[in-house]
């Protein structure tokens, strides 16, 4: 049987909370014969922030990708750096998350340049919330020696 553990955005919005859920997952994995499947949401506020910036683009307002990324980039990287203790694992996690953040910045800059938000581009932008939180949790689990999750 499979056990699905779902964690919302509030559960992953700080390093301490990420460590708490990683320990819950580790305990469940250790104490259960079930396969554990973990689902994490975007960090609290990320989806709203993406909707906000795309709404501004749709309304023809001048949008600063740089200001958006000044908020998003350090927030995600700070959580990661404070949740993971193993330097090697942290460096791998930083690489993955930084690449995603760079991609987010580039996609957003392109949308601003075109001054057009299509349903497809909005969906793609919104996917970054989960795509950023997932490796943070995954590498935190690796930090706890759960490398196959």
Residue ranges and their predicted role:
Residues 1-147:
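Nucleotide/pyrophosphate-binding catalytic subdomain
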């Amino acid at each position: 049987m499979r056990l699905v553990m779902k964690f919302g955005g509030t559960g992953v919005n700080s390093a301490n909370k990420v460590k708490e859920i990683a320990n819950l997952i580790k305990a469940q994995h250790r104490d259960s014969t079930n396969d554990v499947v973990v689902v994490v949401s975007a960090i609290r506020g990320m989806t709203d922030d993406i909707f906000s910036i795309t709404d501004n683009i749709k309304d023809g307002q001048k949008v600063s990708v740089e200001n958006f990324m000044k908020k998003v980039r350090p927030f995600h990287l700070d959580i990661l750096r404070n949740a993971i203790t193993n330097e090697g694992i942290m460096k791998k996690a930083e690489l993955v998350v930084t690449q995603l953040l760079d991609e987010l910045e580039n996609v957003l800059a392109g949308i601003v340049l075109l001054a057009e938000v299509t349903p497809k581009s909005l969906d793609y932008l919104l996917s970054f919330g989960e795509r950023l939180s997932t490796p943070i949790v995954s590498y935190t689990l690796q930090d706890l020696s759960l490398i196959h999750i």
